[in-house]
């Protein structure tokens, strides 16, 4: 109880298909258990990256994975690995660095620790989430070269070297398309170019759109066509079922 959400086999229909239910939890600086259960607080991402110590990072998140196992949590909503583009970004402390190489190395070391215990980490926010002000509507206009060499390089390393199997998209847009339904990012780069074969999710209650169209949180078709697997998060009160299914 008190975790961020559950996904997968959350209904009788899905469990009947053999799909297990998984539990995810914030966050990059230690587990957040809103039920009141105490958890250890970890150093933030910037401090950890300042050590340049991969083995220490792996050891720390091996411990984290064991704590997740104790609390029946399958998937950590971290590491956060956006680039320090501006010193006033409200979540810079959560992210590793302005350097994409260091970001990818530290994320890979963190994932190694989690994976050693059977836990998974979710690399986020994919991508261009480099400020907090109006981040639900932010449009990060980025050239192809800057995107691949700076803003995506750490994610690429986390996928190829770190073996990441869970990715979270952002609240905002990249070049006019909200990342929750951005085919070029989620399929073209992540899956096709990098060979990612894992699980993707949106950030919580994210906007979705098609190029040139207004955002719509219920445009799940655009999300599905982009191969973004799960919209986070919904409750039964948000679902409208056909009469025949009631």
What label would you give each PLM region?
Residues 1-244:
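Glycoside hydrolase catalytic-domain context in secreted enzymes
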